[in-house]
């Protein structure tokens, strides 16, 4: 039960926080399209509204009016299981304590069964790892602990990735795991002299849409607590090492191009990936085109560095979700033609350099190459702005086994033949790291097999551990 989602938390006395949260979640819709939800605290109780669907489908003006209050958390969800069950949507609520609490989570825990067993809980009855965390917190709170103490106790035992927002009576807490696998940032509503409220969100564009000022990223292991009086910070968990391990795929694919991560704008980083990828190649072609959306900045960079003209060869249907984060493989492959349509006049007879962000399973890329050939492309040369995806991610990306990963089971020549392209090349790991320009501050386990946090890994049917 793995999720890579978007989370929001807002405290703004006197403001319509439900509508603010709606706009922030809309800015994070790319991080998950299966379900959306909000929880607010008003009149001494927490109200939760959540359902399957996009943010615009789940919430209406009437719904948002019912969520009036000064404290809110929100969530957009992408998962690998339970997608048809709206009860698996977040935030998760528990009635423990005086007012109860609600929780929303981006990431994936790797020791859920151990946590459940130690607490005498059947994990199979839990809807997700987020549901399990909420249950463990409720056990502590019902035993007399404050929510802050319960968070320290429970999260110190959790392994894996979590960027989490928690709504309590008149408080919003935001916590990041000790490695900083998933992004989380803090923003201010109003000015420094006239603060109107505070916002935490997975990505900075969720702050921009509210007119909030970016303050900083929440540090690994840090807990930020927001009340009507302001913001306080504590080091809830000990950071794991002197450098955080933000997922490298946030730069490659997940994050919006206008997001800032670790001080770097994602769009600029993706253009640099394309430039360095072009420097690896000596290719004669007529047109460089990117696969929308993540591949376009890299294609622009490739064209700049190679001298081959940049152009558009694919039109994207904006009403179709992202194929990588569709919940199952059949839908991913089928959605390619619904999502993308070739510009035949730009493609016909042309030798194309097609830049995409990644190849994970290969099914969508295979369909894409076939579509371009049907449109009359003379050659289709694939250039990928990330190295081969070789290892499963246990920290929140939908790749549970190596059997699903094309590069883990085939050579590049075999991949090229399977996909049907004329040539295939990936950016080197060294060039990807150079493009991001961060010294050891990213998790690249999916590319190297070097997992920074302990996690069970199935290799040839044998469960081992990688540290």
Regions found by a protein language model. Give the residues of each.
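Flexible loop/turn segments at secondary-structure boundaries
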Residues: 17, 80-81, 111, 173, ...
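PRPP-dependent phosphoribosyltransferase catalytic core
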Residues: 155, 170-171, 196, 211-217, ...
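A conserved beta-strand->alpha-helix junction
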Residues: 59, 131-134, 310-321, 416-436
């Amino acid at each position: 039960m793995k999720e890579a989602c978007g989370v929001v938390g807002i405290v703004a006395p006197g403001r319509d926080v439900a509508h603010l949260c709606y706009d922030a979640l809309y800015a994070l819709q790319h991080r998950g399209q299966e379900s959306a939800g909000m929880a607010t605290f008003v009149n001494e109780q927490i109200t939760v509204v959540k359902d399957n669907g996009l943010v615009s489908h789940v919430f209406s003006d009437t719904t948002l009016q019912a969520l009036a209050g000064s404290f809110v958390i929100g969530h957009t969800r992408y998962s690998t299981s339970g997608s048809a069950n709206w009860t698996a949507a977040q935030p998760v609520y528990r009635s423990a304590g005086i007012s109860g609490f609600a929780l929303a989570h981006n990431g994936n825990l790797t020791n859920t069964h151990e946590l459940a067993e130690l607490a005498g809980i059947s994990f199979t009855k839990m809807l997700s790892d987020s549901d399990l965390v909420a249950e463990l917190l409720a056990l502590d709170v019902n035993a007399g602990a404050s929510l802050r103490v319960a968070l320290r106790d429970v999260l110190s035992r959790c392994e894996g990735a979590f960027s989490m927002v928690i709504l309590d009576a008149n408080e919003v807490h935001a916590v990041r795991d000790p490695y900083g696998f998933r992004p989380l940032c803090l923003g201010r509503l109003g000015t420094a002299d006239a603060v109107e409220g505070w916002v935490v969100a997975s990505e900075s564009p969720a702050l921009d849409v509210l007119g909030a000022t970016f303050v900083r990223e929440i540090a690994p292991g840090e807990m930020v607590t927001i009340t009507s009086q302001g913001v306080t910070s504590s080091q809830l968990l000990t950071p794991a090492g002197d450098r955080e391990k933000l997922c490298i795929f946030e730069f490659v694919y997940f994050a919006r191009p206008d997001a800032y991560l670790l001080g770097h704008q994602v769009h600029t980083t993706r253009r640099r990936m394309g430039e360095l990828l072009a420097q690896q190649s000596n290719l004669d072609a007529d047109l460089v085109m990117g696969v929308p959306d993540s591949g376009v900045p890299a294609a622009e960079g490739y064209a700049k560095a190679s001298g081959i003209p940049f152009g558009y060869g694919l039109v994207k249907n904006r009403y179709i979700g992202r194929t990588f984060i569709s919940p199952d493989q059949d839908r991913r492959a089928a959605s390619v033609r619904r999502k993308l349509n070739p510009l035949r006049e730009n493609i016909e007879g042309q030798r194309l350099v097609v830049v995409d962000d990644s190849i994970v399973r290969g099914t969508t890329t295979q369909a894409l190459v076939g579509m371009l050939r049907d449109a009359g492309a003379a050659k289709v040369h694939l250039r990928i702005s990330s190295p081969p995806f070789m290892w499963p991610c246990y920290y929140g990306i939908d790749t549970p086994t190596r059997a699903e990963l094309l590069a883990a089971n085939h050579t590049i020549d075999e991949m090229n033949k399977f996909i049907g392209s004329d040539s295939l090349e990936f950016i080197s790991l060294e060039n990807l790291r150079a493009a991001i320009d961060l010294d050891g501050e990213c998790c690249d386990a999916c590319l190297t097999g070097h997992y920074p946090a302990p996690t069970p890994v199935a290799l040839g049917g044998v469960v081992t551990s990688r540290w």
